[in-house]
A protein has these predicted regions:
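Activation segment signature within eukaryotic-like protein kinase domains
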Residues: 142-143
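Conserved short submotifs of the Hanks-type protein kinase catalytic core
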Residues: 88-104, 108, 112
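Conserved activation segment of eukaryotic-like protein kinases, specifically the C-terminal portion
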Residues: 197-214
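Short beta-strand micro-motifs within the conserved protein kinase catalytic domain, predominantly
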Residues: 72-91
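Protein kinase glycine-rich loop
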Residues: 13-19, 24
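Protein kinase catalytic-loop region centered on the HRD/HxD motif
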Residues: 148-158
Length: 341
């Protein structure tokens, strides 16, 4: 119990997920003055209790942004509990977040539409069918939602640094949400204490979607364009149906650092030009704003074609031409808001 909020979870239940930081279980949160009403939540038990992992968990829990395309975080809970074997009181740490009923974008792309508990996600099936018949609109629908979420995250001062299909959820409620803020960081802290958390790791994010500055360990140059690069690779995969670079991690890293994304594989000229701008090696030549990238995608969706940009990745405002359309800490506040929904 913390800040008049009571929570519980069942360790015998099927975990919602598991990673290097901990195990996520389905849970419930109650008001202490009304235990008959509760909201379903996901509770991450932090099993890696190294100090840097605890600090990352606290940072992740603090990213409490209310947006339909972002996972809602409710707070961080430190608690003293008896060890199951020695019965000695030891600290345990939890991150409380929104419980999503859905499947990852990665699963959907592989033709998996059921959750671990056997629940069928109809929206994921619809998107998959759309991808089989209309790759352009499939790409636009998914990327529009993702770009809106990332744009909000950026406006709040954070970069995600791990954008890939496994960290995007498609829900029963027909929402597409970005999840997992484990390596998300405030841009303002790049040269501060948070940089040490970054330096303690090896490679941030998935190699398949990693920008050159991520792979080079160039922490001081991690910024909003780092996410833009990953979004470009993701857009490529959605349209083409495959990643631009394949092979072992070493060869993929070399390709991201010095190779060219084969954008010619994208048959739609508008989508192709957006991807080309997003994945440029030089950061100042990429889109400098996800909002502008979204504007370009919206224009393409509306039957307009984006022309070559100004070389700074700032979009093509004024250059659109018509074409034929082709087909916790802060736990109480977070939970209180959730109860009001």
């Amino acid at each position: 119990m913390q800040n008049q909020i009571y929570y519980d979870y069942d360790t015998d239940s099927i975990p919602l997920g598991q990673g290097g930081m901990g195990i996520v279980y389905p849970g419930r949160c109650f008001r202490t003055d009304n235990e008959t009403e509760y909201i379903p939540v996901a509770i991450k038990l932090v099993t890696n209790t190294a100090q840097d992992m605890i600090e990352r968990a606290m940072r992740e829990a603090s990213i409490q942004i209310d947006h339909p395309n972002l996972l809602r975080m409710y707070g961080f809970i430190p608690n003293m509990e008896p060890d199951p074997f020695t019965h000695e009181m030891k600290p345990r740490y939890y991150v409380v977040m929104e419980n999503l009923d859905g499947v990852s974008l990665e699963s959907m792309l592989e033709g998996v539409f059921c959750t671990k508990t056997g629940s069928d996600i109809g929206y994921a099936r619809e998107l998959y069918d759309m991808g089989c018949n209309d790759r352009r609109n499939f790409t636009v629908e998914i990327m529009s939602a993702i770009l809106k979420g990332v744009a909000c995250l950026h406006r709040s001062g954070y970069i995600h640094r791990d954008l890939d299909p496994s960290n995007i959820m498609i829900t029963r409620d027909r929402e597409i949400k970005i999840i997992d803020y484990g390596v998300c960081k405030p841009v303002a802290s790049i040269n501060g204490a948070d940089a040490k958390l970054t330096m303690s790791g090896s490679i941030i994010g998935k190699v398949d979607y990693a920008a050159p500055e991520l792979l080079a360990g160039d922490v001081q140059h991690h910024n909003f364009t780092t996410d833009v690069y990953a979004l470009g690779i993701l857009m490529y995969r959605l349209f083409v149906g495959a990643l631009p670079f394949e092979g072992d991690n070493s060869s993929i890293m070399k390709a991201h650092l010095s190779g060219e994304v084969p954008a010619g594989n994208i048959s739609d000229p508008g989508i192709r030009r957006i991807v080309e701008k997003a994945v440029r090696k030089q950061q100042d030549e990429r889109y400098q704003s996800v909002d502008v990238m979204l504007e370009d995608l919206s224009a393409v969706s509306g039957g307009l074609a984006v022309q070559d940009s100004d070389g700074k990745g700032n979009g093509a405002h004024g250059t659109w031409v018509p074409v034929l359309a082709a087909t916790v800490t802060g736990l109480a506040a977070g939970i209180a808001t959730a109860f009001m929904i």
